[in-house]
Amino acid sequence: MFGAGDEDDTDFLSPSGGARLASLFGLDQAAAGHGNEFFQYTAPKQPKKGQGTAATGNQATPKTAPATMSTPTILVATAVHAYRYTNGQYVKQGKFGAAVLGNHTAREYRILLYISQQQPVTVARIHVNFELMVRPNNYSTFYDDQRQNWSIMFESEKAAVEFNKQVCIAKCNSTSSLDAVLSQDLIVADGPAVEVGDSLEVAYTGWLFQNHVLGQVFDSTANKDKLLRLKLGSGKVIKGWEDGMLGMKKGGKRLLIVPPACAVGSEGVIGWTQATDSILVFEVEVRRVKFARDSGSDGHSVSSRDSAAPSPIPGADNLSADPVVSPPTSIPFKSGEPALRTKSNSLSEQLAINTSPDAVKAKLISRMAKMGQPMLPILPPQLDSNDSEIEDVNTLQGGGQPVVTPSVQPSLHPAHPALPQMTSQAPQPSVTGLQAPSAALMQVSSLDSHSAVSGNAQSFQPYAGMQAYAYPQASAVTSQLQPVRPLYPAPLSQPPHFQGSGDMASFLMTEARQHNTEIRMAVSKVADKMDHLMTKVEELQKHSAGNSMLIPSMSVTMETSMIMSNIQRIIQENERLKQEILEKSNRIEEQNDKISELIERNQRYVEQSNLMMEKRNNSLQTATENTQARVLHAEQEKAKVTEELAAATAQVSHLQLKMTAHQKKETELQMQLTESLKETDLLRGQLTKVQAKLSELQETSEQAQSKFKSEKQNRKQLELKVTSLEEELTDLRVEKESLEKNLSERKKKSAQERSQAEEEIDEIRKSYQEELDKLRQLLKKTRVSTDQAAAEQLSLVQAELQTQWEAKCEHLLASAKDEHLQQYQEVCAQRDAYQQKLVQLQEKCLALQAQITALTKQNEQHIKELEKNKSQMSGVEAAASDPSEKVKKIMNQVFQSLRREFELEESYNGRTILGTIMNTIKMVTLQLLNQQEQEKEESSSEEEEEKAEERPRRPSQEQSASASSGQPQAPLNRERPESPMVPSEQVVEEAVPLPPQALTTSQDGHRRKGDSEAEALSEIKDGSLPPELSCIPSHRVLGPPTSIPPEPLGPVSMDSECEESLAASPMAAKPDNPSGKVCVREVAPDGPLQESSTRLSLTSDPEEGDPLALGPESPGEPQPPQLKKDDVTSSTGPHKELSSTEAGSTVAGAALRPSHHSQRSSLSGDEEDELFKGATLKALRPKAQPEEEDEDEVSMKGRPPPTPLFGDDDDDDDIDWLG
């Protein structure tokens, strides 16, 4: 009987029309004035009429009730296109409704965006500091209570102006006292903003602000022909206009709300002179502007309202009252407001159901408005049934209604279809017998005390048959009174609200009394109806007694007796129900007393909790501001630290590369030092042998004269052999050129490979740059959120990327090292092959040299010169022994100075180590230079005296002697930055009297070997050299290295050197020397030392096996490795000492020259010319050494360290490289 209407529960409170905003606030009662169709009477012929339709009229009566303090009203509502600002751009959310809601008594105003009445989108509380930023093209932006930026576009300019105007009025209403001018842009325009001193023509309209809205219009330019002209800052208008119109632009419109304090100017008010204490509202539009500032200045005075500054953080009272899923009619909870709840809800249900206070207030207001009004409408007069049937139906409905209604649960619908405003009407008396107790019973849930009443409803079942016979609508009506379940669950994230007020207990008591009176009235009506029914039954019995027969009369009497028994039973049950109702009413009063106590206690708790929440919200706000500031600071520091880390890693890689290069330099210098020591030992042995052979040469000189004539004939034969050897030499030169071409091709290949490697490195850098850009974007995203999990994830990602970066860098470094190692091994293999060829050429040259020396040893002039210079040999021996001791002394001095700079247990940076080593080497080098300059000055003075003595005796060899004596000091004097080129005349005149074949072959072999090694090593280092450098190859012979051959300074200087040497070649070549040009291009690495050793070897006896022939140029001796170009700076010290050895050997060679003159005097002129002609022509190669030494000394200043594989080596620019 009571469970047949479950299908219609969801439609009980559904609206009849669309989702209109007016249904939220009780403005659509005019459309619902026809009553609730569920409670209309229908004839038995139409039992189901109107059951499926929606009901919207159960709250139609109080539509004229005035508004109360707890009901929000709609100030303006319109349709907008909403955009939400996410990830740096506005994303369209669709077409929403936008409304400004306000409660004037509580001074609370809000902007609401909603999709429908059940789906609110966002809420923004309007306060004095709230900013609604107006944009062109009907756009406006604001921040909601969750600090989310929204942009809304109105469909028309009129709607935008009205909405903005209501927002400004709401800002004014939200404060109790207005102290400053409030302004709100209604329409924004482009162009410069007005400032103080500008002249304006404005159109305005002024209202008085009355009862929270715009009141009477007291002045306007709409009815005037001319606009108002004014000048800002002149004082002729009120202060509110002076302040409020700053920053406006031509064509812009603004709403100004001026308090009384700002409504008077220095010279009165503009269009009205009466004094007023009201707030004035102006709508001002700028029509024309004349700027006072110059036309060239471009200053823009923009007020704060035009900026995009975010609105302030919402107050503490908004944090818990406005969840995301709150209903659109929600108003934030505020301490001091009466939080009304339904009387019949139990405490557990009140705590479990998290409804917003606005919904509870709206329901309570609707219940109070319907107090004492009929639930059922007045029946129309055209019903077919008689009065008794109507009365019986009304009796059943009136008696059954209180039984059914307690089981109806309250609806948790977020937007009630009609929210009537509270009325002050008293309960009205019932008009007819169809009045129900109260409509408020339809919206409350049952208390435990009502369960008995609902259980006793089964006592009315005997009337079911009668209802089905005459009034089938009764069951349909009761079926509609089932509990209405909520149409959507309560919001899960919303905290429970605690409400309470002082007048709640009195209100509940009055409502309980009204319920009791209504129940008593209903019971009395039931008793009256029963008495009326009894009288009718008695009349029927009397009427049918005389007219019916026995059998019908017995059936009638049986029927009436059954009816009478039922009536008696009903009367007894009615008495029992009356007693139960009295007991329950007493129990309800007790429960009401308890509820009032609990409400008072709850009120105290609510006040305390509100205070605590306010304190917590304030502390949370300060904490969040502090944390945001800290996060920003931490992010800035993080960016700085990442930049420093990148710079540090780059510097570490550079220093590691430098450290490896210096380690290689150190090992090579140590090898060179050991080899130089071995070479000094060999020179000592050779010097002792030369002394022993001097005595033998005295004996053999007598035999040399007799053999001279025979050897003269042999000389012609040897000249023929020399020509053949020269042909072989040309062939070897062709081979040399082919090998040089191969080397150049290999250099080009290495250059291409290096360029490819650099391109790969550039691509890797670009990829790393893209990864860094992505990381920066991630950093920007993480700055918005303060979630710690996101920060940890970011740190993990950064750590992984850093490890990947380091792994990739190590992998690339290893691959680059492998490539350079392979190239170095290939060049070493080529060098070994060239060395083998060089050994073969040296053997041929040595054989020829032995034959030539056998001829020249027979000259008596050498014997006489050696006898004269015996006293000078002791100085030569001492000079030869000096280099080893000096080398030891210098290295010991370097070691001791470096040892003082470092401690064994300390760790040092690579930059500091490099700088210390460079300073130490520089200091030792400068000390040696000072000593060497003194020695050079002494030796040069002695040699000049010797040259002065030899010039009258040797006119043909005057230039040769001067060049040989002066040339050894050239490398010493030119050891510092200036190193000019050696003149080609000296190269030609510095000739040793040897046959051209030996010198050509030996020097060509040395040149090839030096070429192969120097170019191979330079190819490893630089990858490619300019083609001009092929004309000046690097040479090396067995002997103490005078300098470490570096790479020339550049292609320009080498071109000039080649051009000078080639230009001097015609002067160097004699008429009978066909290979003069080639000799100019050949450069000897160790000119002075080779010259002296060659001159000493001239006196060896051919019968003794020529022990000196293999001394300086023995192919079996290991030759010192040629260092790289960047190792020049580390070899300054040993080079200086070995230069002293050259000076000593040169002195010995100069001492031998007088013997040549004596020998020449004993011979005839023709024979002498024939003997020394060819040797003089070919003597160019040994003296080309100063030119190369000059180049070496220029490069002694040091070339910068090699460019690292990764990154720019800008950090090393500040190191003064030995300069």
From Swiss-Prot:
Keywords: Acetylation, Actin-binding, Cell projection, Coiled coil, Cytoplasm, Endocytosis, Endosome, Phosphoprotein, Transport. PROSITE patterns: FKBP_PPIASE. One of its GO terms (biological process) is endocytosis. GO terms for cellular component: actin cytoskeleton; early endosome; growth cone; membrane. Residues 197-290 form the PPIase FKBP-type domain. Residues 53-66, 421-433, 1090-1100 have a biased composition (Polar residues). The modification N-acetylmethionine is found at residue 1. It is found in: Cytoplasm; Cell projection, Axon; Early endosome. The keyword Acetylation applies. Residues 41-66, 294-349, 381-433, 739-761, 931-1219 are annotated as: Disordered. Residues 957-971 have a biased composition (Low complexity). GO terms for molecular function: actin binding; peptidyl-prolyl cis-trans isomerase activity. InterPro entries: FKBP-15_dom (IPR056598), PPIase_dom_sf (IPR046357), PPIase_FKBP_dom (IPR001179). The PPIase FKBP-type domain seems to be inactive both for FK506-binding and enzymatic activity. The central coiled-coil region is responsible for association with early endosomes. Interacts with WIP and actin. Interacts with TBC1D23. This is FK506-binding protein 15. It comes from Homo sapiens (Human). The lineage of its organism: Eukaryota, Metazoa, Chordata, Craniata, Vertebrata.
